[in-house]
Amino acid sequence: MYAVIKTGGKQYRVAAGEKIKVEQIPADVGSEITIDQVFMVGEGESVKIGTPVVSGATVTATVVSHGRHDKIKIFKMRRRKHYQKHQGHRQNYTELRIEAISA
């Protein structure tokens, strides 16, 4: 069984037992969260598509850890003007383990 969920402004295709990294969620490590924005649930040949969400469908996940992604480098330059700008960014994330999908 799999589902398409929305969290942190992004959509993820998840299945039970998977680990995913999502935008940071304010929850303690080891706590269980419930995601109710489920857009699609599928099992074998049967697929339920919501308008926009599947009513009564939830995904239960456990917070595994919090962390930060690798640093990305931003470099801006204007040629012949001696203008260069360096910047870096590290995005925070929360790692979730999908426990169950109920539809």
Swiss-Prot record:
Keywords: Ribonucleoprotein, Ribosomal protein, RNA-binding, rRNA-binding
InterPro entries named among the record's database cross-references: bL21-like, bL21-like_sf, Ribosomal_bL21, Ribosomal_bL21_CS
Domain of life: Bacteria
Any Pfam family hit: Ribosomal_L21p
GO cellular component, one term: ribonucleoprotein complex
GO MF: rRNA binding; structural constituent of ribosome
Claim: Ribonucleoprotein is one of the keywords in the record: yes
A single GO BP: translation
PANTHER family per record: 50S RIBOSOMAL PROTEIN L21, LARGE RIBOSOMAL SUBUNIT PROTEIN BL21M
Stated role: This protein binds to 23S rRNA in the presence of protein L20.
HAMAP family (alphabetical): Ribosomal_bL21 (MF_01363)
Protein name (database record): Large ribosomal subunit protein bL21
Species of provenance: Aromatoleum aromaticum (strain DSM 19018 / LMG 30748 / EbN1)
GN (gene name): rplU
